[in-house]
Amino acid sequence: MDNLTRFLAYAGDFEKTFKDDDWKRLAPCFAEDAVYEVKGLGLDCRLEGPTAIFAGIKKSLDNFDRTFAMRKIEVTSGPDVEGDAIRMGWTVTYGRKGLEPFPLRGRSEVRYRDGKIAYLGDSYDANMEKDAAEWSARNNVVLDARYA
């Protein structure tokens, strides 16, 4: 199986996990020494190993994503495959009754080693910090998507 097919399978399993919190389903996708790195939007962190990665992602989902009734993911560029790396741009639009839609823009990079994710990175567009602060002020909502 090629890495893009692996990643698409992982992404599908991630969406299932988003719904049911069964993180064991994702464990086979990650190397034991995998790293997840987040850059931008004041969320900068580096999580090492599947246990820490899943705990950090779950924290962010519980405190941010799952507070919205709607979450729509759109790939805006790529995926670009180069060797063992895959890169793509995306926008996730969040919605909840009584609030303006909140578009979160960024990029992801995944690197594979021996068929498993060795590195997963998310970085947010440079203007997202300003956009998020303005959205929060207009909607009287405090956003907390921290992973650590």
Indicate residue ranges for each PLM-predicted region.
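A beta-strand edge to alpha-helix "cap/lid" segment located at domain peripheries
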Residues: N3, L61-A148
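Short, low-complexity N-terminal intrinsically disordered segments enriched in polar/charged residues
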Residues: M1-P28, E32, R138-A148
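Residue-level detector of alpha-helix boundaries and kinks
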Residues: Y10-A11, V38, G42, G95
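Alpha-helical interaction segments
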Residues: L4, L8, G12-F14, D20, ...
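Short hydrophobic/aromatic segments of transmembrane alpha-helices and their interfaces
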Residues: F18, V35-Y36, E100-P101
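Hydrophobic alpha-helical core bundles mediating ligand binding, dimerization, or RNAP-core interactions
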Residues: A11-F14, F18, F30, I57, ...
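A solvent-exposed, acidic/Ser-Thr-rich amphipathic alpha-helical stretch
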Residues: L4, K24-I86
